[in-house]
């Protein structure tokens, strides 16, 4: 949709340790500013002063894919230059937003290179918190992929983490990029089999999706024994934090804001064990992350800091 903005600059958040695309999926209008001062812009369309390149160097190639433009923009800002997205300078990207990548390369490179960026640039006093936030995020993805039987995606999560803390850069080994097995077929097959559902909270988008899967399904106005009750939550991994019952029932399913679904006894068992599994994962992996941070600060990053001065 050419009247929608894919993104208009990027912001690096060292509080939550993530990068966000500004104005993503926002309708283009006069309310959008023409100039946006930001941390980075898309490498697909940019102009860079020669002086900035002389100071900050060329765009890093070690990432192979993803996060290279983010790191370059961030480095350029560290050398005192401004990074600005211009509304009059635009290009159109022809892509299907619903297209699913055939393999796990996006998942692998986004995870590995994002981890490397924050291990490299986070302030020393924030590294302990950074390690916990990023490891939690990776483990959550891994756990959800496991629940969705996306075993290749789950293996890609762990491969990206291990390569990040081992200092692996460049193109990934062939055994790290696998076929994408995140199909969402469990969601589809579940609603294909239902005759009636009751939604505790209105969600027109979810209702439309369910009707597309099963045009004959009936949406009840009140809960009843003949209908499956749909309960919405922020995260199916955190439903215990919202006082939802954890006893399995075939007549109740949970769907979170990312449309992940909890609908089986096996899912419920995994949810009950999520927190202790997470704590064991953090205990095992956090020291390795902090060791890699120390290696970066004593190696390549120390040299870059001297260049800044």
Functional labels for PLM-detected ranges:
Residues 1, 53, 90-91, 97, ...:
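Short, solvent-exposed loop/turn segments at secondary-structure junctions
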Residues 1-56:
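Acidic/His-rich active-site region of diverse nucleotide-sugar glycosyltransferases
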Residues 126-193, 259-309:
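Non-catalytic, C-terminal membrane-associated alpha-helical segments of glycosyltransferases
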Residues 218-264:
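Short, well-ordered secondary-structure micro-motifs within conserved domains or adaptor modules
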Residues 36, 78-165:
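Active-site-adjacent helix/loop segment of glycosyltransferases
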Residues 192-221:
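Short, charged N-terminal beta->alpha structural module
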Residues 1, 30-41, 45, 81-84, ...:
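Peripheral/terminal regions associated with large enzymatic or DNA-binding modules
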Residues 39-58, 62-90:
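A short, conserved alpha-helix in the catalytic core of glycosyltransferases
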